[in-house]
Amino acid sequence: MGRRYFGTDGIRGKVGDAPITPDFVLRLGYAAGKVLASAPGRAASGARPTVLIGKDTRVSGYMLEAALEAGFSAAGVDVMLAGPMPTPGVAYLTRALRLSAGVVISASHNPYHDNGIKFFSADGNKLPDEIEAKIEAWLDKPLDCAASDGLGKARRLDDAAGRYIEFCKSTFPAAFDLRGMKLVVDCAHGAAYQVAPHVFHELGADVIPIGVAPNGFNINDGVGATAPDALMRAVRANHADLGIALDGDADRLLVVDHTGRLYNGDELLYVLVKDRIATNGQVEGAVGTLMTNFAVEVALKEAGVQFVRAAVGDRYVLEQLRERGWQLGAEGSGHILSLDRHSTGDGIVSALLVLAALKRSGKTLAQMLEGVTLFPQKLINVRMKPGADWKGSEAIRRAIDSAEQALSGSGRVLIRASGTEPVLRVMVEARQATDANRHAEAIADAVKQATA
């Protein structure tokens, strides 16, 4: 039986619509608390579980925080409140403080009217599927509030921001500083607005912060990693050396250089791998996704680095890294994983890794990416009849085979069905845009004819 509420990145939706309602979130807190309290060894030790709750800057965060806190308390679980805190900050603090679990109230890069709940285990990793399944099972049980002397207690973690700032700084080499660098830091009016500027300033940079005036409604609105034009303009206007774009919960990173050129997660992954090769002499492998640009795969293989594609989603990149014992992975959207630095994607830490790579090499981003030109992509969404058997179509298979044969070694074809609507996504990459367009349109035409 599939999970009813948990997706690949927790539970998410529009506030006020199921399941993102205060009554459901209260029951979710209670269910999670009961699962934590029943963990092996917990009852025998007599120790009360403690969870950390952090959130981004959405107006609904206060309501959902109160609901979660009430649910955990009713289950006899103590709560520590971090206030606005990046998702990776909650993961770090949960691990560092030896807590039972961490919870983030955020919908990441989504608009303010959405929100979500994401859990971290005691080691700062996302919850295993089996624990999420146990929480869902508890949601069906009646809420049996603990007796008054068994209720969980709640308190603020007053030094949460300071602890996380120091952790981020600790990932930057002690031999380097950022003196003499002018950085524009875009916090997306989100969870990092209180911490990110301080991290770079305390390392010596001249910081120009933007997206640091949250009002509950403006998170990700025209700023941040999902809207980098604001950062590109600010970098040029302020003659900055570099621009750093985070998203609403600060687990994504995009970078802008002094010319206003934008670098995505695919390109930054290549930069970090090349830096590791220069530092350590070898990188066994790196992980991208089905959407990672083919040019990056080619460049990494030419550098002697194995490259594996995971399903789309940082959760799947992480799974592949752990399975292979590798350190570096990324999505083009800016989720960058460096498992020797953090257990999860962290936009601030990733920015510091990029800055350290530039310091070590003495090069600009453009210079580090010389010879790597992203292949043009053509994406066509083809609407089909619900239930259409596109996989069984010989005409579609022939169109795909023809494109793959023509592009052999110089491009690729990716066909993906949408998980939410009867749409087939046809994506073709090639060295020349004309080739990408021609092959994508040929496949799309075959799909239309076969599924009409």
UniProtKB/Swiss-Prot annotation:
Cofactor(s) listed: Mg(2+)
Post-translational note: Activated by phosphorylation.
Amino-acid positions noted as binding Mg(2+) in the UniProt annotation, renumbered to this chain: 108, 247, 249, 251
Residues modified as Phosphoserine: 108
Enzyme Commission number(s) from the entry: 5.4.2.10
Residue ranges that the Swiss-Prot or TrEMBL entry lists as coiled coil: none
An example molecular function term from Gene Ontology annotations: phosphoglucosamine mutase activity
Main function: Catalyzes the conversion of glucosamine-6-phosphate to glucosamine-1-phosphate.
Database matches in PANTHER family: PHOSPHOGLUCOMUTASE (ALPHA-D-GLUCOSE-1,6-BISPHOSPHATE-DEPENDENT), PHOSPHOHEXOSE MUTASE
HAMAP family assigned: GlmM_B
Similarity remark: Belongs to the phosphohexose mutase family.
Protein name: Phosphoglucosamine mutase
Biological source species: Burkholderia pseudomallei (strain 668)
Gene encoding the protein: glmM
